[in-house]
């Protein structure tokens, strides 16, 4: 390697009497100049460039550009970043392995070496997205849900077992173990990585990309990582660097301490609201300030977890004493902890009290000002003070959209032989769920202590509330049991339902039939309260119109109150055995009580639960597969089908064709999420995907979810834009994935319209508002549109991961000029679009788009090409990132 800076910076350090080689930033600074005030997150990127300098993908100019960021706290330069490893969950992991298997076949067909389709860096896939809350509220719930999960997903799990033996450096954490981000935080994350290279131990920062947007949770451990689409992760594991612009870094200063009774959840909802308002899309956020001295690592992880909700690429907490304390608690070895400390201090990556790096911009929060909060009814950044929730519920747009004028009456229903009344505003789901909060002992112990006080006073969960507890790791069950709090949670219906994502990703399972019927009969607006990180409309359950994010103790409190109209700050939750009112303040645990309970968490719990993390149950071990390099696709499978994206691929890319006469398939508003574009939850029987499954002999009870069927493109393309809450402005007043087939006026499903347009040879476009593609790092939100024939998406702004995914699938993202929108243009959706001269496209260039209206009049608008880097342009010209990777393997 021609690597003067690289070679000049090579040095050694000692940790626990072991010598490690590393690429020293202080040595590099002799040529680069003083970099001591560079944000710690950028120091991680700088080391990455230094270590990978080869004169081609990483040049000396790249390294100087990153070091020179300090001059203006900004740099307009593309860099090639190579993460140390890749993390996956099964909803995104299964289609990724499908792609890898199909890539092997494509390489073989084109005369290449199939063994090149193998991960070059470690890949951990954690199965956590498949368990559904079918059973709840009793001691058998966990076993029943696990049994159903294995039954429904057997075919997918066989496929993943095949992948385990077919691909090197590919590990699978079996179902029933935990949530990938929590397993990453508690076990997989190293903070500093070390490996043997040419008989030398080399140390470098632990970095990763993950196929789930909440990969950022690991930033709480001082590990730089973020979510990417599955296709980008596949490219990364095959050795392709992640192309990125050197980011702006927003400094978030935390001071003071949380007040008595305020939780980490209240803090993260406040931080999310502040950062959304500030505007951090595509930027790094780095936390600093004396508030970090006493902020537990679990609280840091909670804040880092929600980076996608505040819009940032990551929410980074530098390594310090709190990091080391957590690593010891969670069972990391003494050698590892010593290496982390020595390395971070040697590299200037260690957080010292009083550190004030240079930032692009800054915010500050005195944590003592944080108040008890929820977020809702349908966006994580919409924080509401606890006392204002009834007002926010009443004002929610869902109430206005629906038949709001009529006074909704309570509906009688019979459940288990008893008659009840289901009121409007009922809380029908109360779920302690999600890696965001179940990785945090203080809020879980608070929930258990609140449950204990409630049960002692004789309070009960309201009969219409479906309650559940789904921890992100088995350690949670151990410490709740050790603190003797499990029986009280069980008494209120918060029995263990599984170790996985469950309600947070829409796997809330069915509501009891009498409740579902009562909601439909009374057209009731009901709510879900969950300790999750997302509350987008239609995500948690199709019949639940408002979703509220809250801390675990507040989830328990809402299960007792049972209604969003009750003001938990002033109204009683219920009555004790004497008939006296009981208020939230009467059962809220003190800080001292919570601290005493948290002392029950021990290193032995972590070591016990992670000793055999890759082993799995007997049922998992009994899945046998034949060893083979290529997969034997089953023609009649409704779960796993060969990926169609490489079928007609040739060894050389064809020139990009201009887009002429494109029809608008959908015209959408602001904050359209990847869940709107490609839902993960339940499949309706009368939807195109539901009809496809029934035509292939699948009964409704076996539909499973869209997420579980991502290995079958036939289901997924039919499920594109099929969210029941999506609103296409081309069909006013209609909810769900419908559109008009133009030039006629017939209203049909988006899938059926797209297939007609394909037969007619008509390219397609999508028009949208701000924040298009926010939410999950869902690559099917780009793969599905590609299969429908969408060539271009024109929006007011894009969220980071989705923009990248569109390019990765060969779809052109264009941004309206400032001040121009679909509304200012008066678009009806009947226009035709021409986008020409695509062979001469340049990153960030102005692209003329010609609109031809129904009356024949024309208008040209100058859109901005959101292909931001030269590397992204190369991917687009190849028809997608994986096509580029395959062609590279052939040469």
Model features per residue range: what roles?
Residues 628-702:
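Segments forming glycine/polar-rich beta-alpha architectures that bind adenosine-containing cofactors
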Residues 288-295, 533, 754-755, 759-799:
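Extracellular/luminal Protease-associated
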Residues 199-344, 350, 443-463, 495-609, ...:
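Mobile "lid/hinge" segments at catalytic clefts and subdomain interfaces of large enzymes
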Residues 54-257, 264-269, 372-375, 394-494, ...:
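Long, structured ligand/cofactor-binding scaffold of large enzymes
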Residues 82, 100-156, 286-287, 292-404, ...:
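Terminal amphipathic helices with adjacent charged low-complexity linkers/tails
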């Amino acid at each position: 390697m021609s690597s003067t800076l690289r070679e000049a910076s090579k040095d050694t350090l000692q940790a626990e009497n072991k010598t490690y080689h590393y690429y020293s930033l202080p040595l590099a600074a002799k040529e680069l100049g003083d970099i001591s005030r560079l944000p710690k997150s950028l120091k991680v990127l700088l080391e990455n460039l230094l270590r990978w300098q080869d004169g081609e993908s990483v040049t000396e100019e790249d390294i100087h550009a990153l070091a020179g960021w300090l001059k203006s706290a900004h740099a307009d330069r593309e860099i090639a970043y190579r993460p140390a490893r890749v993390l996956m969950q099964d909803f995104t992991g299964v289609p990724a392995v499908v792609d890898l298997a199909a890539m092997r076949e494509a390489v073989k067909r084109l005369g290449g070496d199939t063994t090149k389709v193998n991960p070059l860096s470690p890949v951990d896939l954690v199965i956590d997205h498949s368990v559904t809350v079918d059973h709840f509220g009793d001691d058998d719930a966990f076993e029943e849900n696990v049994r159903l999960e294995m039954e429904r997903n057997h075919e997918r799990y066989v496929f993943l077992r095949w992948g385990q033996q077919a691909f090197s450096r590919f590990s699978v954490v079996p179902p029933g173990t935990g949530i990938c981000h929590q397993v990453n935080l508690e076990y997989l994350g190293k903070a500093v990585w070390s490996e043997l290279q040419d008989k030398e131990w080399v140390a470098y920062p632990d970095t990763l990309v993950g196929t789930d947007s909440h990969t950022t949770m690991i930033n709480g451990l001082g590990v730089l990582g973020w979510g990417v689409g599955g296709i980008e992760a596949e490219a990364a594991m095959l050795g392709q660097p992640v192309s990125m612009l050197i980011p702006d870094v927003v400094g978030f200063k935390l001071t003071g301490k949380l007040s008595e009774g305020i939780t980490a959840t209240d803090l993260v909802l406040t931080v999310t609201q502040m950062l959304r308002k500030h505007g951090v899309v595509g930027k790094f956020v780095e936390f600093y300030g004396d508030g970090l001295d006493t902020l537990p690592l679990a609280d840091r992880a909670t804040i880092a977890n929600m980076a996608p909700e505040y819009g940032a690429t990551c929410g980074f907490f530098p390594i310090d004493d709190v990091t080391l304390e957590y690593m010891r608690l969670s069972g990391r070895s003494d050698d590892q902890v010593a290496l982390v400390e020595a390395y971070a201090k040697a590299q200037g990556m260690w957080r010292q009290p009083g550190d004030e790096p240079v930032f692009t911009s800054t915010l500050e929060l005195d944590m003592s000002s944080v108040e008890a909060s929820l977020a809702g009814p349908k966006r994580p950044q919409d924080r509401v003070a606890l006392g204002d929730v009834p007002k926010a519920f009443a004002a929610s747009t869902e109430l206005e959209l629906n038949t709001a004028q009529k006074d909704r009456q309570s509906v009688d229903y019979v459940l288990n032989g008893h008659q009840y009344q289901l009121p409007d505003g009922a809380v029908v789901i109360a779920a302690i769920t999600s890696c965001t909060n179940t990785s945090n002992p203080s809020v879980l112990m608070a929930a258990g202590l609140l449950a204990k006080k409630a049960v002692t006073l004789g309070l009960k969960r309201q009969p219409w509330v479906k309650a559940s507890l789904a921890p992100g790791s088995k350690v949670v069950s151990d410490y709740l049991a050790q603190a003797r709090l499990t029986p009280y949670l069980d008494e209120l219906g918060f029995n263990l339902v599984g170790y996985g994502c469950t309600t947070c990703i829409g796997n809330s399972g069915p509501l009891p039939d009498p409740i579902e019927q009562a909601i439909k009969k009374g057209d009731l607006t009901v709510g879900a309260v969950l300790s999750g990180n997302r509350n987008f409309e239609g995500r948690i359950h199709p019949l639940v119109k408002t979703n509220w994010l809250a801390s675990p103790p507040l989830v328990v409190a809402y299960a007792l109150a049972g209604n969003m109209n009750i003001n938990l700050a002033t109204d009683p939750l219920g009555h004790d055995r004497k008939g006296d009112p009981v208020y939230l303040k009467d059962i809220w645990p003190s800080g001292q009580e919570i601290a005493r309970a948290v002392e029950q968490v021990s290193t032995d719990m972590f070591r016990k639960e992670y000793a055999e993390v890759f082993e799995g149950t007997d049922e998992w071990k009994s899945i046998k597969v034949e060893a083979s390099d290529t997969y034997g696709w089953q023609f009649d499978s409704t779960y796993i089908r060969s990926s169609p994206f490489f079928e007609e691929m040739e060894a050389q890319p064809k020139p990009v064709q201009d887009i002429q006469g494109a029809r608008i398939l959908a015209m959408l508003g602001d904050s359209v999420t990847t869940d709107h574009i490609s839902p993960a939850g339940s499949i309706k029987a009368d939807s195109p995907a539901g009809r496809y499954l029934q035509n292939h002999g699948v009964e409704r009870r076996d539909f499973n979810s869209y997420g579980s069927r991502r290995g079958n493109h036939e289901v997924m393309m039919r499920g594109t834009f099929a969210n029941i809450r999506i609103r296409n402005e081309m069909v006013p007043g209609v909810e769900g994935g419908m559109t008009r087939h133009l030039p006629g006026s017939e209203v049909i499903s988006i899938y059926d319209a797209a297939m007609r347009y394909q037969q007619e040879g008509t390219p397609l476009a999508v028009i949208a508002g701000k924040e298009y593609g926010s939410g999950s790092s869902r690559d099917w939100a780009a793969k599905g549109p590609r299969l429908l024939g969408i060539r271009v998406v024109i929006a007011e702004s894009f969220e980071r991961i989705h923009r990248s995914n569109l390019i990765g699938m060969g779809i052109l993202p264009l941004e309206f000029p400032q001040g121009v929108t679909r509304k200012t243009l008066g678009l009806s959706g009947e226009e035709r679009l021409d986008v020409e001269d695509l062979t001469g496209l340049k990153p960030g260039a102005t692209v003329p788009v010609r609109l031809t209206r129904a009356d024949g009049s024309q208008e040209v608008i100058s859109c901005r090409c959101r292909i931001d880097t030269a590397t992204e342009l190369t991917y687009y010209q190849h028809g997608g990132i994986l096509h580029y990777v395959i062609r590279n393997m052939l040469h």
